Amino acid sequence: VTEYRVGTGFDTHALEEGVPLVLGGVRIDFPRGLAGHSDGDVLAHALTDAVLGAAGLEDIGALFPPGDPALAGADSLELLAKAWERVRIHGWTLANADVVLIGEEPRLAPHRAEMRRRLASALDVDPDLVAVRATTTDGLGFTGRGEGLAAQAVALLVR
């Protein structure tokens, strides 16, 4: 019997001056970056929580505690890959994933293909299995005011 599981993930970080902006593992030329203990990559963080949740495992904060000095400035794609290994040990494979950036800017279109490639590489899957999209909140809320960015992700696992 084939078993399917769905997981969701959500992450948000404040935008901060003097910090590089990394989204989907791609460094983007932008005047502000995402504050966080790691590189603040909300796309990778949301996807990490989605795959962990689908497998019924702990969340990203339990697996990689934000206060752990060893994780300061960590590459979020490496964290995603480590989390994915825990998921794979339980026999799961990725059917597909969908990751959405929520914010007014930056525009993702010029970077989308590379983000898909890098997120998929961390999961050791074909980029066709990982969708990367963006939406705005039409100026509403903290993302609409440009105070931060958010991301949500859905992952479907199969075994």
Model-derived features: where do they sit?
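RNase III-family endoribonuclease catalytic core
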Residues: 2-118, 122-123
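Short acidic capping loops at alpha-helix termini that bridge into adjacent secondary structure
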Residues: 126-129
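Pyridoxal 5′-phosphate
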Residues: 132-136
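C-terminal edge-of-domain segments
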Residues: 145-159
